[in-house]
Structures are given as structure tokens and as C-alpha cells.
Amino acid sequence: MDNQQESISEDITGDLAAAVRKSWSESQDNPLLLNFNNSPIGTPTDRYSPEPATMMEGNAMNLSSLARGSTQQQQRLYGSSQTREKSDQQQQDYQLFKHHYSLGQETRESVSDILNDLTLGSPEPSERASPIRQPSVDVPPLTTRRSSIQDVQWIRHLLNPRSSFSGASSNEPTNSPGDFLNQSRAWITILHDSSAESLQAVIVLAESLKNVNSQYNLWVLHSSEVNAFQLAQVGIKTLIIDEYINLFMNFGTGSGFSASSQSTETKGELNFKWCKLFLFFSLIDRFELICYLSPTCLVLQNIDELLESTEVSDEIDNETCVLLSNKVNYINEDLVSVNQDQSSAENYDDDPQIIILKPNRAVAMCIKEYFTIYGNDFEGESKRSMFHQMNDLQIMKALFGDKWSYIDSVGYCAVPIASVPANRLNYKIIEFKILKPWERQNYIAAGQHRESIMNKWLDLWRDFLNQAN
């Protein structure tokens, strides 16, 4: 009896070991086990007839029942030699566990991969939920093991495709570094009044910049008393600077101008007299670098290097250098430079046609402090009187005389004092504040001399009118 039990025990041990080995050697993708309904471990009971006797009674094992059914059970579980040969060609229908993995060349061990590989379902088909499908995301095929941070970013992308973790949308336009420069740098000019002549001059300046294919916009500063509606209609950008003009008009009691002095100054007058000071105030946080151009200038060649040159930008650090400008170059009919200080015929000012600066709060505060008057004593009144006698250029020289640098204006910018042939001029910028081709008597005279430089200005104005009509 003992020998029989030992042989049965050995058979059980060998059979169980063989069963475990077979279950672990089976392929993961067994089509016979995809729709099991009964046993959680995948042994379908409806494919086998019930045993005639109970194999387990309580916690004791019924050895006689096991002995009687051992032969049949072995055939059922493992089959005969012929059955085993057939089983090599088709999948076994019995697996103890189904959570082993076939690790191929593309090994993936992230959390989402393991969950997708596991077959988790409830025993009852009515309670099984439909399989969860991953959203279709256009990604390249996996050839390497994904890291956990990549999985986190992928999940965040699914939750919020527009978040910072999902990258830029393919539908959104891409910006190049040049686009940022175009927005942070600009040409600036100032409209002093609403006269037809002033509007014509600004329009010709804007058209000349377009003709030379400048990559930067022209902005026109003006007060609310100046009507710049016509400029906006033709696509020129404008900016009202009343807030900064009022800063100079209304410093308050004990600081700034007295009430009697304020009444003598209008916004238009301050806009004309101190207009260049507003460059330091009105463009802070709007542009990083600006180039002021006189409103009566005509640009004949591309001058974008004034805004793009690293030498120019690096020179202005708002400490040792606050601004760059040109030195005024007056030329006569013989193309000879005229020194305005030594000219006996007429006194020419030294207002530059080009001013390059970086709007900065510290520089603006320096100008504001310069205008601040503490107390109403004689010294304060003298300072008030001095301010009303100074123009913007004089104030800038008093403040930044030792921090003012100049660009080489030889062959760059000229102010002709007489009509000269256009083909003899080799300058990028021509200033027409003396020739004034917009005045009737001057453009009539220019019509009689087609080679005159004034016809460059008049031709551009006529082209604009033809396009507008």
C-alpha cells in the first residue's frame, strides 16, 4: 500500500511539473483562450466531462479516486504520444497563468506597455468592458526603449494637447528669429502738425522705405491735437503720445513749471520743441531698438543695417553711450560740404536726420529728474525759464553730451541747400527740409529741371497718388 502511494505521489509530482513546464512554454497569443468564460485561469470546463468521483474531500486528498482517474486524466491533460505530436502543431488549451512576455527586439518596459500586454478581464462576459483603444497619435515607430518621462509627457499630451508638454501645433505658424527682430525694432518719425505738406512728407518717407525693401515698420508719433487719420488710412502705423507730453506740462506744484508757464505751452508747441525727448519715454517696453528718421527725409538705398548691425546695437549700452546720430552734412550745388557755423548766408541748425537709441527706464528717469524742480525759490524760477528757452536737442546735449556717439555719415546722408542733379548724388538718405519740394514754387521749378534731385521726391509722391486712385 505504501509503495502504491509513493508511486502515485511520484506520478503526481512528475505530471504537475510537466504541466507547469508546458504552460510556461506555450505562446502568449493563444486564440483558443481569448473567449474563455468559466475558469479564471483559463481551463474551460465545458470541454471535459465531469469526474465520476470528487478528487478533494475537505482538506484530504481521495487517493483511490485519483488513482482510478490518473490514467484518463493524464490522457486528457497531456494526451497520448500521437496527441502530443499533434499538440506541437496547435496550441494547448490549458495554461496555469498568462502573464509571461515574449520579449522581441523592440523591448518596451514602460507602465503603459505592461498594462497593454496583460490580458485582464472579468469571468463573466456580461461584465467585461470593451477594450480601451489608444488615441491615434502620429509618432514614429518605436525602435528604442521609452523612458518613464516620455510616458508622462505622452499622457499629458492626451489630457491637454495644447499644453506646453505637447509641443507646438502643426497648424500654428512658425516664427523665425528675423520675425522677432522685425517686431522689436522700428523706424520712428514725428508728425508735428496736420498740414498737407507735413502729411505728404511722412507718406513719401514711408513709401521710400518700402521701395528699398526695408524689413521694418515705420511708426509715426503725434499728439492728439494732430490729425493723423490719413496716415492710418494708407497703412502707416501711428502712436499718440499725449501721456508723455502731459508729463512735461504738468509736473505739479513745487515741481516742474508754474501755472503761468503751463498756460503758455500747448501740446502742439511742446510736440514741436521737445519731440525728440519723447523717443526716450513713449517707446519703453514696445521696442528694444529704434532709429528716428527726420520726417522730411527720402531714403534712396536700403538702410536696415542701422537696426541690424551688431556694432551699432552693442555701442549703445545706456551707460557709456546713450544714443548714436549722424553729423549734419550740408552740401551746395557743387556737392561741397558747407559748415553751418561758418556760413554767412544762412544759419543752418544741427538737428540730426538719424538718431538711434534703446528706450530705457533709467534714461527716462534721468530726463524726468533733470526737469524736476524742488521749491519755488529764485533758483527754481531760473530753471523754469531756462527750460522754456531750450529745445530738445539742447537738453539732450546737456544731459548726454559725453554719452553721445556719431556714425560715419560721409556718403550716407546729405542735406542739399540748392537743387543738384540726382545722378551726381551718391547718398542713401537725402534730407529735403531746405529744398521743400512739396511747396508749389519748388515743384514747379523742379519740373523745369528733370535732373534735379527734387524730382526723386516728386516722382515717389506721384506714384503713391496713382496707386491710391
Swiss-Prot record:
The modification N-acetylmethionine is found at residue 1. The lineage of its organism: Eukaryota, Fungi, Dikarya, Ascomycota, Saccharomycotina. InterPro entries: GNT1/Glycosyltrans_8, Nucleotide-diphossugar_trans. It comes from Saccharomyces cerevisiae (strain ATCC 204508 / S288c). The keyword Hydrolase does not apply. Residues 25-42, 67-82 have a biased composition (Polar residues). The modification Phosphothreonine is found at residue 13. Keywords: Acetylation, Phosphoprotein. GO terms for biological process: chaperone-mediated protein folding; meiotic cell cycle. Present with 1850 molecules/cell in log phase SD medium. This is IME2-dependent-signaling protein. Seems to act indirectly to modify IME2 activity, thus permitting IME2 to carry out later meiotic functions. One of its GO terms (cellular component) is cytoplasm. The modification Phosphoserine is found at residues 23, 27, 39, 122, 130, 136, 147-148. It comes from the Eukaryota. GO terms for molecular function: glycosyltransferase activity; protein-folding chaperone binding. Residues 22-55, 67-92, 117-143 are annotated as: Disordered.
